[in-house]
């Protein structure tokens, strides 16, 4: 009787320890459809500046993305006293958990990871081939500008791409001033006679003179203006403001015309 009681007592703690281990296994092994997956992304400057940044790679399965997580989990478990390895049994997505203790835990972890990779070898080969095809397509396509080129703060039109400096147009040189008209003696004599008659020309009179002297109306108009200005300077008539300034010594401009100027000027 005493031996049976001792055996029952030994069995009970074993059952309790087994239940605790089963609870731990169930806690760490949720269903395959609800396994949380962490996506690893590299936010380095070199990757951000590339044109293909942000595009989703084709041909990479979900299991390939979890390789790194399984490897890191195996290494961290090898350092601890108890190690649990998730091993996919088949295509259904179910997995079994193996607890390993002792010196052989690192070897078993490596073997299980190699087996799991062996099961998915076809997927890795297909992903490698797809990546090579995408790289060859990228080389065939023309060079794409990175995204930061279209987001510069100095661009007035961000969607138009990088700015190209336009060559400056050569400034059109101004035409030289019209040379002075060299009037003939007959033309000057006729203009002087008309000026003595009347210093200001009407439109009809200017048109008739232009036809008679074979000149432009503007040439006749300019000659009359210059003639009036010369006479005004020669007479020396000054307005009241000029006289007031001269009394204060502030107005000393010469108003007499120089001798020797021809009427053609």
Swiss-Prot record:
GO terms under biological process: neuron differentiation; regulation of transcription by RNA polymerase II
Pfam families linked to this entry: Engrail_1_C_sig (PF10525), Homeodomain (PF00046)
Chain positions covered by the region annotation Disordered: 1-38, 75-140, 156-181
Cellular compartment(s): Nucleus
Biased composition (Basic and acidic residues): 1-12, 102-115
InterPro entries, A to Z: Engrailed_Homeobox_TFs, HD, HD_engrailed, HD_metazoa, Homeobox-engrailed_C-terminal, Homeobox-engrailed_CS, Homeobox_CS, Homeodomain-like_sf
The entry's keywords: Developmental protein, DNA-binding, Homeobox, Nucleus
Keyword DNA-binding: yes
Residues within the DNA-binding region(s): 176-235
Disulphide bond pairs: none
GO MF annotation terms: DNA-binding transcription factor activity, RNA polymerase II-specific; RNA polymerase II cis-regulatory region sequence-specific DNA binding
Top-level taxonomic group: Eukaryota
Signal peptide: none
A cellular component annotation (GO) from this entry: nucleus
Compositional bias per record (Low complexity), positions renumbered to this chain: 122-136
Similarity comment: Belongs to the engrailed homeobox family.
Protein name per the record: Homeobox protein engrailed-2-A
Organism annotation: Xenopus laevis
Organismal lineage: Eukaryota, Metazoa, Chordata, Craniata, Vertebrata
């Amino acid at each position: 009787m005493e031996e049976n009681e001792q055996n029952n007592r030994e069995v009970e703690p074993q059952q309790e320890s087994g239940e605790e281990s089963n609870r731990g296994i169930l806690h760490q092994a949720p269903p395959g459809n609800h396994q949380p997956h962490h996506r690893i992304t590299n936010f380095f400057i070199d990757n951000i500046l590339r044109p293909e940044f942000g595009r989703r790679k084709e041909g990479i399965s979900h299991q390939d993305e979890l390789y790194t997580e399984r490897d890191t989990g195996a290494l961290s478990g090898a350092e601890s006293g108890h190690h649990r390895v998730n091993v996919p049994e088949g295509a259904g997505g179910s997995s079994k958990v193996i607890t390993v203790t002792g010196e052989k835990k690192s070897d078993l972890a490596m073997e299980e990871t190699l087996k799991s990779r062996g099961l998915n070898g076809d997927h890795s080969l297909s992903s490698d081939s797809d990546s090579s095809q995408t790289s060859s397509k990228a080389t065939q396509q023309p060079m794409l500008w990175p995204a930061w080129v279209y987001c510069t703060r100095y661009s007035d039109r961000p969607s138009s791409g990088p700015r190209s400096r336009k060559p400056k147009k050569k400034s059109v040189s101004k035409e030289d001033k019209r040379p002075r008209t060299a009037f003939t003696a007959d033309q000057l004599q006729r203009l002087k006679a008309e000026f003595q008659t009347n210093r200001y020309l009407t439109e009809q009179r200017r048109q008739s003179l232009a036809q008679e002297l074979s000149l432009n109306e503007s040439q006749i108009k300019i000659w009359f203006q210059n003639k009036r200005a010369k006479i005004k300077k020669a007479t020396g008539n000054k307005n009241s403001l000029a006289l007031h300034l001269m009394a204060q010594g502030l107005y000393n401009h010469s108003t007499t015309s120089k001798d020797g100027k021809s009427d053609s000027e």
